[in-house]
Amino acid sequence: PAHHEICSLSWSALSLWILRGEYLMIQQIQLVLSPPTDVRIPQSWSYRLYGWLMSQISSEFGEQMHLQGEHPIAHFLCFSPEKQSLIWTVNLLNDAARQVVSPVLESAKEIPLHELTLPVSEVRTFPAVSAEELIRSGRSRSETRAKIAFLSPCAFKQSGRYTIFPQEALLLQSLIAHWNAAFPEYALIDPDALQALQQGLHIVDYNLHTTRYLLKETRIPAFQGNVTIEARLAPPLLELWNALLSFASHGGVGIKTTLGMGGAATDFYKKTPVI
């Protein structure tokens, strides 16, 4: 497929996508789980939940997904203090995943695992969104600061090693890679625009701790917490950055988002003046 560049010079391709009716949609579904009160469920159990999900869908879809190297599902598990329950957030990042996986999640009453069965007390299905809507959301925002919360263990891989601090370049590269995988028709490939984006981003605050994500027999070095990023960008690039941030809660950040890592949420706000 033809790639459309989104850069500092032009967003004109947007109207062309709208005329073509090319709305690639992604969707988020949350399952509120109610484990026994005396059982502590680690976040790494999202990998087991994913195993259950794969067992519920057609083997043909699963095989096709793995053969093509696609990762159309990003998910994570976290505890909600308000609900006093576990929330499994599952993001379906292409139309095939939405059609195949969403009926399984929406009809789930319980999830049997080897150790125990997790009752599903509530299913929340959020409206599907398109790249065009995320871009429009980016256009509507004028905030220059954003706080990214890493809700499940997050890590990057650089030169064959795990990196456990969210540098600006790694964050940007990860968000763009996930965006391009979900929206290949809207791929962000203009190197000049991407370099300008990177130069305008600065981490100005962070509250992080290191952790480990247990995956089979491997303990992956990772981090959790939050970072605040200030964007000093020309308006078209700020729109693009804000669109990527809006997408972060769907596509996740960093490596192994298909296996429960890199769950994220974003808050936008204006810079507080220094008195």
Question: What does each model-found stretch correspond to?
Answer:
Residues 3-4, 23:
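Low-complexity, intrinsically disordered or signal/transmembrane-proximal segments
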